[in-house]
Structures are given as structure tokens and as C-alpha cells.
Curated annotation (Swiss-Prot):
It comes from Rhizobium etli (strain ATCC 51251 / DSM 11541 / JCM 21823 / NBRC 15573 / CFN 42). SMART domains: AAA (SM00382). It comes from the Bacteria. Its EC number is 7.5.2.7. This is Ribose import ATP-binding protein RbsA 1.
Length: 512
């Protein structure tokens, strides 16, 4: 088989869940030695497609061919056995096991009936090196790694299975920029070795850098396949959403709000993670936190939300100094703060519970009367939020796990809006969701700010900081090194400040 011929085909694939059509007559052909990008909004059918490829679910109609021969998978193990391995967006790692245990979990090396730890470590080290993550020690527990490093372990685990076709579902959404570059280098090397790769991402610039072939899905159908680089980003997005695509970011206000600050901090420090943080935010502002990942941005959000202990410095709400004792205190009526977490699966949602239960739990005090939930008030609140965020769900009593990723993220945001917060903290809120949902979230943030909310927005995506924020505070090594505003919020300035490149702006503090 030549490199230009498909190694794997799916023809006329359909899948239904009850009355809902997840896939309808979908086709795709994957070549050896090529990276094939699969694009589409959340709910377009991409997840069902790769679950069928990976043996997680079986199609109702259609056929799959590997090397020209028709095949069917009864389980993920059957797909793995022929060399098809998937790295899902929801990590499959077991937190309480070591990195080496996770990498070799399907086929641990044995000696005398016991796991051969020396061989296991060698396999893990080789896989981590191949994944560009040789700095991760095989014996460390997965739960002790940050999310970005866990994703690298997941990729190493897939490579340890020696795949012929590897499927990556939003594999870079949790990664730092340096890790993304390492993954790109790995994928390009695997392509050069003749491996077939399927790459799912909502980041258009990643598709432009990596892909050889592209297929767009919409409403469960494969809309068009084309060689990468033959369509503009706007044309691709219009294929994805089925309508004309306008500017993704809403307009910013012409003038900075003049009200008194709603939130202020002075010389806020925490161990060696935060140092001398000083700034104000006013009602109606969207203030971004920039900088390389891991420079204290998440710690700062947790400090404001009452999670961190032994803080030094001052925090004031409406000019009155406060000591935020807990998240419950931070979200209480006098302060009225909300935190949209980074990982919706583990921090933002209770997946087995219903949409209704997930939404109501953050506002029980407000929608209860004498300890009993007022169902009429609850329903009114939920209906209003469904309209505001355009949440798509068959019913509010369905498990939230059954929603698409974009709608799950909308539920996370809606949950915190149930409390009508005045201060909203967002930790990379659009990670792993489609461009259409991102645009809806950007519009919502500006609408909330226009309504008087103060928003602190951490994002690893420079385009979001540029498009959404009135000001950006760039952090480096736990400190704010530069404030950018207006035309200065551009990629050149953001990168320079993130690297703390010298000149008069280096180590610049924000004046009270």
C-alpha cells in the first residue's frame, strides 16, 4: 500500500441514540503518513465517530475497512489489537497509580508471575521520551501531576501500544505552549515514519500547522473533505456552522469604566507562588491574566475565591478590606463571587447527576424556602439561563454527562450565574470547545460586563486575551510584570511580556 492510499476507511456510518441521530451516512478516509484533521462544532458527531473507530461503540449502519478489508470492533481491546489507539479528551489515567503503571496497564511486563518493575520502567521511559516528556519520572503518581503533564502521559500511554493509527481528541487543549510544541514535533515525526494520525482540535492555527487532509462534520454528517491549506479559516468555520461567520469577538467599550473598584488587592503574596500582586478591577471591566502557563494565574484566582490559606497582603471588596475564608464565603451575598474552573469534568460538574441538579446546587440558599427547594423558582431560573446561554439539552432532567462538551461548559457557567455574581473569575473557560460555542461565551462575557459584572479572565489563548479583554495583566514567576491596554494588547507585546524580556517594562508593577 502506498503512502497516498487510505489505510482506514469509514463508509456510510450511522449511529442513533434513541431518537437522536449522532451520525448519518458519514464517510472518511485516512492515509498512511498523513495527519487528518476532523473539524466540527460540539455535537457535530466527531466524538461518536472516533468512539466507533476506537471500538467504544458500534455503528448501526455502514462499514469500516482496514487495509482494504472490512472489519468490526467489539471492544477497544479489539481496535488496539489491530493498531488503532485513541487519546480521548477525557483522560483515562488512574490517578492513584504511577505513571509507569498507567502506561503499561493493558500489558504489564511480567517475570515469575509478577510485574517486572525494571522492564516496566524501561517501557515507560521509552514511551515518555517518544512523547517528548522525558522529564516526567515513571514512578510519580499521576494525581501528583498537573493536568498538562497528565495529558503528556496519556499520549505516551498510546504510543507504548505501538499504533498504526492514532486518534488524538483535543490532545493539546490542556497543554502549555511548550508542551504543544513538543507534541507537534512528535506528531510530525510519527507522520514521517508512515503512521496515520487523526487530529481533532478546535484551534484553527493548530490545524493549519499540522494537517495534510481535513474533513468537516456538521449535524452528524460528513460535509466535505479537502486538502489542508485550500480553504480560508472563514470558509472552514462556515462549513462547520452552516452559516456566514462574522467577527468572533464582540466590540469593546470605547472608555474604561470610572466607577470605584469592586475588587482591589495590594501586595498579595502566597509562598513562592504569588508575589506583590497589586491591581484594581471596576464593574464593567474584563481584565485578562496573561503570561506563560503556570506563572501564578490559577493561584491568583484561587486566592480570590477563598481557597488558599496563609495569604499575605490585602484584598478589598467595594473598598472594604476582607479576609476570604472559603469559597462559600467568597460566593456569599456580600461578596458575590463565582469561579468557572479549568476542568469541567472533574471540577465543574457532577457527571452522573442531572442538568437540573448541577445547576441548582450552587444556588440552594437562594432558591430554597425553609430548607425546601422552591421548584417553581428553580424552573424559572433554569429556563432563563437556558435562553441566555442557548443550552441544548433534551430535558433538564437528563444526565449532564450526556451533553456535548460545549453544552457541558455552558452548564458550568450557568451554574455559577444562578447566584447572579458581581465578580466572575474564569480559568481557561473555552478549552476544548468549538468555535461557535466560544463565540457565544465571548458575547456572554461582554453582556455580563455591560450589566455591571467585573470579570477576571485567564486564558492560554492569546487571541482570546486580545479579543475579549479591556486590560491584560501579564504574569511571570508569580508577579504581574506588565499591564497592557488598548492597542498594546497584541501578540507581540503579550509574548514579550510573558517571557519577561527586558527593557523599561520588565518587572513593572501595577500602580494602585
Amino acid at each position: 500500500m502506498s503512502l497516498s492510499e487510505p489505510i482506514f476507511r469509514m463508509e456510510g456510518i450511522s449511529k442513533r441514540y434513541g431518537g437522536a441521530i449522532a451520525l448519518k451516512d458519514a464517510d472518511i478516509a485516512i492515509r498512511r503518513g498523513a495527519i487528518h484533521a476532523v473539524l466540527g462544532e460540539n455535537g457535530a458527531g466527531k466524538s461518536t465517530l472516533i468512539k466507533i473507530m476506537a471500538g467504544v461503540v458500534t455503528p448501526d449502519e455502514g462499514r469500516m475497512l482496514l487495509d482494504g478489508r472490512e472489519i468490526a470492533f467489539a471492544s477497544p481491546a479489539a481496535a488496539n489489537a489491530v493498531g488503532i489507539v485513541c487519546v480521548f479528551q477525557e483522560l483515562s489515567l488512574i490517578p492513584d497509580l504511577s505513571v509507569a503503571d498507567n502506561i503499561t496497564i493493558s500489558h504489564p511486563p511480567q517475570r515469575f508471575g509478577m510485574i517486572d518493575r525494571r522492564a516496566q520502567r524501561r517501557i515507560a521511559e521509552e514511551a515518555l521520551t517518544r512523547a517528548g516528556a522525558s522529564d516526567i519520572h515513571p514512578s510519580i503518581l499521576v494525581k501528583d501531576l498537573p493536568l498538562s503533564r497528565r495529558q503528556m502521559v496519556e499520549i505516551a500511554k498510546a504510543l507504548a501500544r505501538k499504533p498504526r493509527l492514532i486518534i488524538l481528541d483535543e490532545a493539546t487543549s490542556a497543554l502549555t505552549r511548550s508542551d504543544v510544541e513538543k507534541v507537534f514535533a512528535v506528531l510530525k515525526r510519527l507522520r514521517a515514519e508512515g503512521m496515520a494520525l487523526i487530529y481533532i482540535s478546535h484551534r484553527m492555527h493548530e490545524i493549519a500547522q499540522l494537517a495534510d487532509d481535513c474533513t468537516v462534520f456538521r449535524n452528524g454528517r460528513s460535509i466535505e473533505s479537502y486538502p489542508a491549506g485550500t480553504k480560508t479559516d472563514q470558509q472552514v468555520v462556515e462549513l462547520m456552522i452552516g452559516r456566514e461567520y462574522n467577527n468572533v469577538f464582540p466590540p469593546k467599550p470605547a472608555h474604561r469604566p470610572e466607577e470605584k473598584p469592586i475588587l482591589s488587592c495590594r501586595e498579595l503574596s502566597w509562598g513562592d507562588r504569588l508575589s506583590g500582586i497589586t491591581f484594581d478591577i471596576r464593574p464593567g471591566e474584563v481584565v485578562g491574566l496573561g503570561g506563560l502557563d503556570g506563572q501564578g494565574q490559577r493561584d491568583l484566582l484561587l486566592a480570590f475565591f477563598g481557597v488558599l490559606r496563609d495569604l499575605k497582603g490585602e484584598i478589598a471588596i467595594d473598598g472594604t478590606q476582607v479576609k476570604l475564608r472559603s469559597p462559600r464565603h467568597a460566593k456569599s451575598g456580600g461578596i458575590s463571587m463565582a469561579l468557572i474552573p479549568e476542568d469541567r469534568k472533574t471540577e465543574g460538574l457532577m457527571l452522573p447527576m442531572t442538568v437540573r441538579e448541577n445547576l441548582s446546587i450552587a444556588a440552594l440558599d437562594r432558591i430554597s424556602r425553609n430548607g425546601v427547594i422552591d421548584r417553581a423558582a428553580e424552573r424559572r431560573e433554569i429556563d432563563d439561563l437556558f435562553k441566555l446561554l442557548a443550552i441544548k439539552a433534551a430535558t433538564i432532567d437528563m444526565p449532564v454527562a450526556g451533553l456535548s462538551g460545549g453544552n457541558q461548559q455552558k452548564v458550568v457557567i450557568a451554574k455559577w450565574l444562578m447566584n447572579r455574581p458581581r465578580i466572575i473569575l474564569l480559568n481557561d473557560p473555552t478549552r476544548g470547545i468549538d468555535v461557535g460555542t466560544k463565540q457565544e461565551i465571548y458575547l456572554l462575557l461582554r453582556k455580563l460586563a455591560d450589566g455591571g459584572a467585573a470579570i477576571i479572565f485567564y486564558s492560554t489563548d492569546y487571541d482570546e486575551l486580545i479579543g475579549c479583554c479591556d486590560r491584560v495583566l501579564v504574569m511571570y514567576d508569580g508577579s504581574i510584570v506588565r499591564e497592557l491596554e488598548g492597542a498594546d494588547i497584541n501578540e507581540h507585546e503579550l509574548i514579550g511580556a510573558a517571557l519577561n524580556i527586558g527593557g523599561e517594562h520588565a518587572q513593572q508593577r501595577i500602580a494602585p
